[in-house]
Regions:
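Compact nucleic-acid interaction/catalytic patches
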Residues: 16-22, 27-59
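C-terminal terminal-subdomain/extension
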Residues: 58-105
Length: 105
């Protein structure tokens, strides 16, 4: 069962498309109906999109390359979308993401 601040491989639907892709996500909150998660990408944060965070301790979380968390596009996933746990975010990254979420609310 995915828990907050874990990194998982999950099936994610592309924006404006029916295409699916298995990609890493950060679990924010496990609610009853949905598991709120954030996309993780290997692309650097984009200046034109606020709410993108460059993970400082990406390798400690089990990721194999530098990664960015996209806070601007939360996902509502269900338990069957989750495939394998990759790891856990470091406290430094958790705190930074919490601060960004509070700032952009």
């Amino acid at each position: 069962m995915p828990n907050s601040w874990e990194v998982w491989w999950a099936i994610v639907k592309f924006e404006n498309s029916e295409e699916l892709k298995i990609r890493p996500v950060v679990v924010l909150e496990n609610q009853e109906a949905f598991i709120i998660s954030l996309k993780v990408t290997s692309h650097k944060p984009r200046d034109t999109y606020p709410g993108e965070y460059d993970l400082m301790r990406w390798s400690d979380a089990g990721l194999t390359k530098p990664s960015t968390v996209r806070l601007s596009q939360p996902l509502q996933l269900i338990i069957t979308d989750f495939k394998n746990k990759i790891g856990d975010l470091d406290a430094v990254d958790i705190y930074a993401i919490q601060q960004l979420i509070a700032y952009y609310k």
